[in-house]
């Protein structure tokens, strides 16, 4: 069967159209299984509006409560007087709870501890017949014991006990009040205590700044005494505390402990005693007033039934005298006394103000002799090889002469302490002799350039002499 060409053209386009219609790209594809499962999960896990509203309300409540907490903490803080009343009426349990928030306490420096007042127990005014107890070592105070007072809370302890305590704590062992004042921005500038700490190395550079700060504070409040040294603690008159300075300032010492006595400052002292809280007050007081052997026996038991009770009925005071500031200024670290401070005159006119200056001049003169000897010996390497042996021997003789003369000079100086004129003449003669010795040694020793020229000239002569000998 024969088909015409036109029929063939009509058949082939139909086949192409059917093939295009049945092609896999034109057929619709089903989505994969993972996409269908994720779409179903999104539809099922959609948050309802009620839950979203509850979350928003809770977040707003937490935000408002945080703002109220900050306002109460920073705007409604108690005043300094209320804080002092709180520390005065604080109980042992409250003090222990407060100590939990000061676990990272690293103590205070020994220089700060040394500035606290020290006195004898027998110097306290108003003592009763029975002795008080130390809250640190749990022992009774004796008449010859040295006590150290904390001016901020007026509590006193054994000197060794409180010193050991303060090296690892910056709070009082009884009331847990901090010895270092809170210098935050929200505190009243006219608070009862002011503490200024500076290192000893920076004292010379900050002394002027401390004086300016003290002048400004005195102008603001005449009742407050401000310390201008590198460590100062200023207290209120209610606690009997005044200025405590270290370094160049005054220190509180008892009149029996300090050598030079200055003004006497009264302090109020708060002491207590361990009493049994299980028994009645009268019976406990009678037991506590007994001999020390019974007290030592009961201290061996648990401290759960005993409490350190402050004696609020009696008013205890102690008068601590301040040590006078010495007229002589202490030398700063790394500072050495200059000859001008001892009255030294380079023209030869010496001034003496005491045995100390004589001793300093003597040491300076001996040091000068040693420096001249070392200067002359250090020029040995400048000498030539031919003259090395002879000049070294002569140099040793001259150094021996200079050292012996230096020893004679110091001997004459020690014998002539009471004759300044003779010592001045001997010192001038010794200086002239040393200058002449040094000048003579320098003239004998050629310069470096001259020795270099001589060495080159000698080498050239040697070369010429060797060439002439070979020619012969």
Curated annotation (Swiss-Prot):
It is a single-pass membrane protein. It comes from Arabidopsis thaliana (Mouse-ear cress). Residues 320-340 are annotated as: Disordered. CDD domains: RING-H2_EL5-like. The gene is ATL13. Belongs to the RING-type zinc finger family. ATL subfamily. It catalyses: S-ubiquitinyl-[E2 ubiquitin-conjugating enzyme]-L-cysteine + [acceptor protein]-L-lysine = [E2 ubiquitin-conjugating enzyme]-L-cysteine + N(6)-ubiquitinyl-[acceptor protein]-L-lysine. InterPro entries: Znf_RING, Znf_RING/FYVE/PHD. SMART domains: RING. The keyword Secreted does not apply. This is RING-H2 finger protein ATL13. Gene3D superfamilies: Zinc/RING finger domain, C3HC4 (zinc finger). A zinc finger (RING-type) spans 134-176. It is an enzyme of class 2 (transferase). Pathway: Protein modification; protein ubiquitination. GO terms for biological process: protein ubiquitination. Signal peptide: none annotated. The RING-type zinc finger domain mediates binding to an E2 ubiquitin-conjugating enzyme. GO terms for molecular function: transferase activity; zinc ion binding. It is found in: Membrane. Its main location: membrane. GO terms for cellular component: plasma membrane. The chain crosses the membrane at residues 51-71. Its EC number is 2.3.2.27. Keywords: Membrane, Metal-binding, Transferase, Transmembrane, Transmembrane helix, Ubl conjugation pathway, Zinc, Zinc-finger.
């Amino acid at each position: 069967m024969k088909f015409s060409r036109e029929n063939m053209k009509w058949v082939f386009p139909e086949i192409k159209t059917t093939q295009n219609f049945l092609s896999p790209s034109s057929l619709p594809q089903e989505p994969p299984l993972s996409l269908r499962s994720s779409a179903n999960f999104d539809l099922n896990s959609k948050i309802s509006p009620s839950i979203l509203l509850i979350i928003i309300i809770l977040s707003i409540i937490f935000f408002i409560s945080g703002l109220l907490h900050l306002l109460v903490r920073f705007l409604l803080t108690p005043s300094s007087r209320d804080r002092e009343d709180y520390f005065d009426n604080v109980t042992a349990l409250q003090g222990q709870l407060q100590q939990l928030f000061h676990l990272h306490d690293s103590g205070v420096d020994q220089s700060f501890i040394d500035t606290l007042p020290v006195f004898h127990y027998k110097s306290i005014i108003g003592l009763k017949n029975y002795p008080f107890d130390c809250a640190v070592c749990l022992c009774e105070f004796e008449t010859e014991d040295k006590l150290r007072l904390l001016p901020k809370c007026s509590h006193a302890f054994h000197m060794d006990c409180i010193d050991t305590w303060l090296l690892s704590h910056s709070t009082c062992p009884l009331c847990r009040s901090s010895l270092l004042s809170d210098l935050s921005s929200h505190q009243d500038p006219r608070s009862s205590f002011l503490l200024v700490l500076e290192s000893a190395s920076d004292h010379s550079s900050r002394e002027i700044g401390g004086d300016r700060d003290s002048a400004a504070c005195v102008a603001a409040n005449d009742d407050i005494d401000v310390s201008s040294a590198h460590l100062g603690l200023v207290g209120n008159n209610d606690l009997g505390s005044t200025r405590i300075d270290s370094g160049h300032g005054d220190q509180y010492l008892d009149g029996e402990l300090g050598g030079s006595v200055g003004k006497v400052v009264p302090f109020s002292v708060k002491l207590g005693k361990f009493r049994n809280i299980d028994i009645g007050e009268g019976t406990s007081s009678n037991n506590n007033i007994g001999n020390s052997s019974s007290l030592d026996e009961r201290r061996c038991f648990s401290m759960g039934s005993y409490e350190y009770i402050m004696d609020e009925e009696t008013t205890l005071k102690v008068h601590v005298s301040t040590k006078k500031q010495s007229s002589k200024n202490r030398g700063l670290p790394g500072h050495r006394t200059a000859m001008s401070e001892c009255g030294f005159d380079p023209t030869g006119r010496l001034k003496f103000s005491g045995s100390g200056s004589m001793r300093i001049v003597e040491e300076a003169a001996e040091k000068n002799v040693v420096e001249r000897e070392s200067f002359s010996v250090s020029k040995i390497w400048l000498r030539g090889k031919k003259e090395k042996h002879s000049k070294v021997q002569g140099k040793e003789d001259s150094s021996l002469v200079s050292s012996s003369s230096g020893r004679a000079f110091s001997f004459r100086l020690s014998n002539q302490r009471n004759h300044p004129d003779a010592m001045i003449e001997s010192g001038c003669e010794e200086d002239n002799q040393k200058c002449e010795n040094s000048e003579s040694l320098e003239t004998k020793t050629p310069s470096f350039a001259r020795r270099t020229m001589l060495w080159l000239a000698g080498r050239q002569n040697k070369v010429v002499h060797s060439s002439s000998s070979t020619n012969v």
